């Protein structure tokens, strides 16, 4: 958690999901009515503060050690002003970008982020780099998430399914409230739970022949699509006809 926040503040969203799971486990134990719960709760609360607040904060502050090494007079006040400056930048950002996208387009990966184009290639060749969705994992995973949600609300859910939904939601829901310029890559942390949801749903059906065939088919489709789109992920030069064929939606536009 501390390392995640040190890399990017959106790691706080993951911390919120962990906190919900932590409190949920404590609540479940309280509902069991076992003796000695409050002693266990006090120990768990102390551990939660220590390992979810104090230790991550220390790790976050320690990530600024290069500042102190380079500039010995760098103070905690300077550190705090860095935090205020970063917050102010993101809170007041008014810039726009041709490849920005809203959160609801991320669910199906409708608007990739274009990073690079090589304009010095021979005629008939193209090279580009874009950040985009893995269509099998994202699209089928979204369906699996909806299936998990239905199982939970219909009383047939599991703790694993609830955990996946909570962690997915705490990564995505905050972005629904953001009005500034956002991009597809903000959904990447949430997309990991699409894969987890897909794994859970397939595990439920593992004893059915058609489910095993479906699993094999999805793996094969994901591998084929990765190979087909690898040039757009890596900048590998390819013939123009191949590049043009990769832009299956008007919103892609990365060649």
Which role does the model predict for each range below?
Residues 176-188, 232-237:
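Membrane-interface catalytic loops of GT-C/OST-like multi-pass glycosylation enzymes that act
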Residues 1-9, 19, 172:
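Membrane-interface alpha helices of multi-pass inner-membrane proteins
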Residues 29-47, 144-165:
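Membrane-interface helix-loop-helix junctions at transmembrane boundaries of multi-pass membrane enzymes
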Residues 28, 45-110, 114-116, 228, ...:
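Membrane-lumen/periplasm interface segments of specific transmembrane helices
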Residues 20-21, 26-27, 34-52, 56, ...:
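Transmembrane helical bundles and short interhelical boundary loops of multi-pass, membrane-embedded
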């Amino acid at each position: 958690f501390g390392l995640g926040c040190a890399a990017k503040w959106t790691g706080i969203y993951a911390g919120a999901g962990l906190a919900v799971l932590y409190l949920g486990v404590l609540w479940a134990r309280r509902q069991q009515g076992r003796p000695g719960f409050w002693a266990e709760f006090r120990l768990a609360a102390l551990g939660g503060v220590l390992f979810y607040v104090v230790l991550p904060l220390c790790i976050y502050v320690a990530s600024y050690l290069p500042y102190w090494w380079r500039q010995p007079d760098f103070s905690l006040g300077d550190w705090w002003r860095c935090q205020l400056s970063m917050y102010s930048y993101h809170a007041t950002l008014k810039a726009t970008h041709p490849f920005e996208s809203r959160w609801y387009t991320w669910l199906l990966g409708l608007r990739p982020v274009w990073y690079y184009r090589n304009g010095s290639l021979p005629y008939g060749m193209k090279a580009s780099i874009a950040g985009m969705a893995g269509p099998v994992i994202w699209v089928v995973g979204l369906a699996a998430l909806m299936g998990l949600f239905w199982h939970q609300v219909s009383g047939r859910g599991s703790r694993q399914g609830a955990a996946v939904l909570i962690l997915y939601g705490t990564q995505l829901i905050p972005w629904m409230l953001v009005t500034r310029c956002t991009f597809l890559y903000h959904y990447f942390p949430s997309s990991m739970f699409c894969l987890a949801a897909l794994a859970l749903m397939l595990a439920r059906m593992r004893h059915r022949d058609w489910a095993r065939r479906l699993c094999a088919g999805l793996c094969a489709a994901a591998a084929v699509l990765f190979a087909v789109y690898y040039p757009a992920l890596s900048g590998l030069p390819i013939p123009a006809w191949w590049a043009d064929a990769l832009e299956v939606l008007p919103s892609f536009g990365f060649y």
